[in-house]
Regions:
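N-terminal secretory signal peptides that target proteins for export/translocation
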Residues: 1-14
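Non-catalytic cap/lid and distal C-terminal segments of serine-dependent acyl enzymes
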Residues: 47-77, 82-408
């Protein structure tokens, strides 16, 4: 083979190799683009101007499809969906009040989320799609959305907890304009059983609520700290050493080194050290839902002069050592240590002790027992009772109301 023939052969080989490589890359690129850029043809949910909402699911081989959502004021509702000739199932939910709604489909007996709706929340192990209905600025739906207002920042922060002997994660909201120069008050916002440091930011829409309240001048700019209330866990499922385990109330079996109440001062010290806070009682508030309301109640007795504002949302008030199978009412009437701690709380004169609960909440009896005892010993509090039960819809309302009462 002469030099000319060799060069032509080599060039031909290189050209073929380049062509095959280019075709392979084009194929891979097309595949990657399909995953990134393809848009589902099915629009779901479609929120109409009157607040009605159309939900759709393409399932041509399905026999029965229904949707279940919290479309009623205080309860979930299951609606049948209708199939067209192309196998597209749909239903239009009648006009809804301003609110954030959750829903999921049921296809031939199998619960599934809406593939046309990328917005999904996790509540313990349950995944649900969400959508928001708003009719005018300032209504509940508006307050749960991101609007054209100044936005605060949301950070996931790791802190050291000497009491629990672990490094733990929490979510911290800093208001728009926070620059490390001005000092701000702090609201500690606690989740319920099965939740974690993500719960209030995701299910509770805490950042959106605070952004909108502050922008409207209804709430003072404040830092909001959302810790993980499970003292035997470092962080939310998938965010620490055990890895991608299935979330659950008692999935992690290891015993905590201390209680949430006993370890809470670790959080306060970290926040006061790392943020520009008003590091005194007048600059601190605390509230929580369900278990977090119980933690708030316990901390108010354990540290009565650390916080000036307390909020119990559908709270589960209890006394660790005193309960032992007893009803709350009996403990309040007979346990002298509990009585002394409530007296100390009363005498500390907090600016606000706020209790909110739904009329059908299973913890209503316990909250009534606590209020009755407070009345008997002259412990001041504000009480709010509304429709509904132990649901996020109520807890978002309570946060909205409580935040407007703080630091004024």
């Amino acid at each position: 083979m002469n030099k000319t023939t060799f060069k032509q052969s080599a060039l031909c080989t290189m050209t073929k190799a380049y062509f095959l490589s280019a075709m392979t890359m084009a194929s891979l690129t097309a595949s990657a683009q399909q995953a990134i850029f393809d848009k589902l043809n099915t629009t779901s949910p479609e929120v109409h101007a009157d607040g009605s909402v159309t939900l759709r699911l393409l399932a041509p081989k399905a026999d029965t499809v229904t949707v279940t959502g919290d479309f009623k004021p205080v309860d979930w509702q299951t609606l049948p969906m209708t199939r067209n000739e192309q196998g597209l199932w749909s239903v239009t939910v009648p006009a809804l009040p301003a609110e954030m709604y959750m829903y999921a489909f049921n296809v031939d007996g199998v619960r599934t989320i809406d593939p046309g709706n990328t917005y999904v929340n996790r509540d313990v192990t349950t995944l649900s799609n969400i959508f928001v209905v708003s009719h005018e600025p300032g209504d509940k739906g508006y307050n749960y959305k991101s609007n054209a207002t100044p936005h605060g920042n949301v950070s996931k922060v790791w802190y050291d907890s000497p009491t629990l002997k672990m490094t733990r994660r929490m979510t911290v909201y800093t208001p728009a304009g926070y620059d490390g120069k001005k000092r701000y008050p702090v609201l500690y916002l606690l989740h319920g059983m099965g939740g974690d440091e993500n719960a209030w930011a995701e299910l509770g829409r805490a950042a959106q609520i605070m952004d909108n309240l502050i922008a409207a001048g209804k709430a003072k700019p404040m830092i909001v700290v959302m810790p993980n209330g499970n003292p035997n866990c470092e962080a939310a499922p998938g965010e620490w050493t055990p890895g991608l385990y299935t979330p659950g109330h008692w999935t992690i079996k290891q015993k905590a080194a201390a209680t949430m109440e006993d370890s809470f001062d670790d959080i306060v010290k970290y926040v006061d050290t790392h943020y520009r806070t008003i590091a005194k009682r007048e600059g601190r508030a605390m509230c929580g839902l369900s278990m977090g309301g119980g933690h708030t109640f316990g901390i108010s007795l354990l540290m009565p002069r650390t916080f000036n504002y307390y909020g119990l949302f559908s709270a589960a008030p209890s006394f660790r050592n005193a309960m032992r199978g007893k009803k709350l009412d009996d403990v309040l009437k007979t346990d002298t240590q509990v009585q002394q701690r409530i007296a100390a709380l009363r005498d500390s004169k907090p600016q606000l002790y706020w209790i909110g609960i739904g009329k059908t909440d299973f913890l209503l009896e316990s909250n009534n027992a606590l209020r009755s005892y407070f009345d008997s010993v002259g412990m001041p509090y504000e009480y709010y009772e509304n429709e509904g039960g132990h649901i996020w819809r109520n807890w978002r309302i309570y946060l909205d109301m409580f935040a407007q009462k703080l630091f004024k």
